[in-house]
């Protein structure tokens, strides 16, 4: 079971987001989606678990307990729905996620996504570090962290003991 407390730090404005599983490498994403309100949509997937991709209503679905990270990208053009949809299409091409958003883009979004200048601009955005990210920790992470801290405490005790001699 993962802790999703960090969702409260997500911005509440338009953006493209990607979910990574614990074994996904650098540019691999399990799911890419878009939202007019990032925090609300990510909460719908991971906390409420009532999004179409998380309810298990199809053969392939999102398992919130397997999501280790959420990355997001923001851009000034994301406030326009057609541009947000176009950017999602470019993100699909760039990252080739395991699962895609189930929405159908508008004709205008398809046209925008085929504009070479726009495509280059979005490729640059998605090639750089995401605008933000959060990690969702699970019990195994906590156990490993405790072990690491115990080892550090033992090392510090040894240093103190050696200085007292």
Regions found by a protein language model. Name each.
Residues 1-14, 22-28, 36-165:
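Boundary/linker segments flanking structured domains
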Residues 33:
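Conserved catalytic cores of phosphodiester-cleaving nucleases, focusing on short active-site segments
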């Amino acid at each position: 079971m993962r802790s999703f407390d960090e969702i409260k730090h997500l911005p509440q404005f338009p953006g493209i987001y990607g979910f990574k599983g614990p074994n996904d490498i650098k540019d691999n994403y399990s799911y890419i989606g878009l939202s007019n309100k990032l925090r609300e949509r990510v909460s719908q997937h991971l906390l409420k678990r009532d999004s179409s991709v998380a309810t298990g209503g199809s053969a392939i679905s999102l398992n919130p307990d397997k999501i280790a990270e959420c990355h997001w990208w923001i851009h000034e053009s994301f406030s326009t729905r057609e541009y947000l949809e176009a950017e999602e299409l470019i993100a699909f091409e760039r990252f080739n996620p395991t699962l895609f958003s189930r929405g159908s883009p508008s004709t205008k979004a398809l046209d925008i996504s085929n504009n070479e200048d726009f495509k280059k601009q979005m490729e640059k955005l998605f090639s750089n570090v995401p605008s933000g990210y959060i990690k969702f920790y699970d019990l195994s992470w906590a156990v490993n962290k405790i072990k690491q801290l115990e080892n550090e405490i033992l090392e510090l005790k040894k240093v103190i003991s050696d200085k007292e001699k």
